[in-house]
Amino acid sequence: MNLQTERLTLRPFSPQDEDAFILGLEDRELRRMYGFPAELSKETARRIFRQFSTLSTTFSLIRKADGILIGFLLDVPAELPEHILHTLPEGGRTLAFATFVPYQRQGYMREAIQAVVEQHSEAEDVPFLHGGHFPFNEPSQRLFSGLGFTSYGQHTIGNVTILDEICML
């Protein structure tokens, strides 16, 4: 399924996206913000691409003006620890995303997430959307807040804290 915004087409990953995806992950700061290892070989990036490609709701964000892959967005079953998940209705989804560095801070991800929120709202198929971010990732926190997500707590994976944002639909 494709989603359209004013400037983007959100479509499933395809093999033609692999090289641009790997190139996009070369940025160390993007990897830090997303939680990827600081050092990421091309083979590991290819493995991540293939893993994401198996999910039917991994979207490539394609800029309409030139057909360039500018990032990705995953829309997967809610991935939250039980102590948070049990306080929410069943059937929520988690959004995870990255905008490649040359295209950040231009509103593209806001458009993409808004399209996914609207699609789920219209379909009435999920009760909530979840997004998580690291405490140092203030741009993601501002993005979620601006889209109507509210702070819902935090959890840890190993020794890493994730702040959780929820948007009830």
Predicted regions and their residues:
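Conserved GNAT-fold acetyl-CoA-binding loop/helix
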Residues: R31-R50
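Acyl-donor (CoA/ACP) binding surface of acyl/acetyltransferases
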Residues: M1-E29, T58, I62-L169
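Soluble sensory domains of the PAS superfamily and closely related sensory modules
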Residues: F52-T54
